[in-house]
Amino acid sequence: MTQQIKYKRVLLKLSGESLMGSDPFGINHDTIVQTVGEIAEVVKMGVQVGIVVGGGNIFRGVSAQAGSMDRATADYMGMMATVMNALALKDAFETLGIKARVQSALSMQQIAETYARPKAIQYLEEGKVVIFAAGTGNPFFTTDTAAALRGAEMNCDVMLKATNVDGVYTADPKKDSSATRYETITFDEALLKNLKVMDATAFALCRERKLNIVVFGIAKEGSLKRVVTGENEGTLVHC
């Protein structure tokens, strides 16, 4: 029996760190294969998937800036790191027979298309995975904000934030064993409780555009499929 799909078009935010696996930095082969396999499963179900990937496994602009590097320069270096991750994801998808396209917010014509909204939407409608690289193309904006922006531009049904924990908790579950996971929470409640779902700019954009967010753990087998079919997975942040 075909499973009912709750979200037809999604924007998946992947952190660069989620590609490291147990390695201290870089891209872990087994981890990227597992992650792409999870995404490929929902693509085959007919879900249209756009991805914004971070670059923290290779370079973190904020950390470099703290070490006296010019912040704008550091952020541009971070954007380059996201392009490297995007190319790795594209290669992994194509190994599985899933068509994927990389669109970069910075012009790099030899290795990626320059971001163009109509073309990206066309690719999604054709069943291709679209990987958005280089953040927003501007310094001082996080990849969370890029994900919110692309999610709004692509008219996505939901933004899915893949993290290393399986949702939003009352406290850090790694530090507080009594922390409990929220199944659902409103944007206003998350603000009131000062829950760090994502950075303030991204959160405000999602709230304004009424783009709901699901925070979930991508490393948990089958978690993405459960999210897109509307099962109780992760935390739904809603209007």
Swiss-Prot record:
Top-level EC class as recorded in UniProt: transferase
Stored InterPro entries: AceGlu_kinase-like_sf (IPR036393), Asp/Glu/Uridylate_kinase (IPR001048), Uridylate_kinase (IPR011817), Uridylate_kinase_bac (IPR015963)
EC number(s) stated in the UniProt entry for this protein: 2.7.4.22
UniProt pathway annotation: Pyrimidine metabolism; CTP biosynthesis via de novo pathway; UDP from UMP (UMPK route): step 1/1
Entry GO CC: cytosol
GO BP term, pick one: UDP biosynthetic process
Protein purpose: Catalyzes the reversible phosphorylation of UMP to UDP.
Stated family: Belongs to the UMP kinase family.
Subunit structure: Homohexamer.
Full protein name: Uridylate kinase
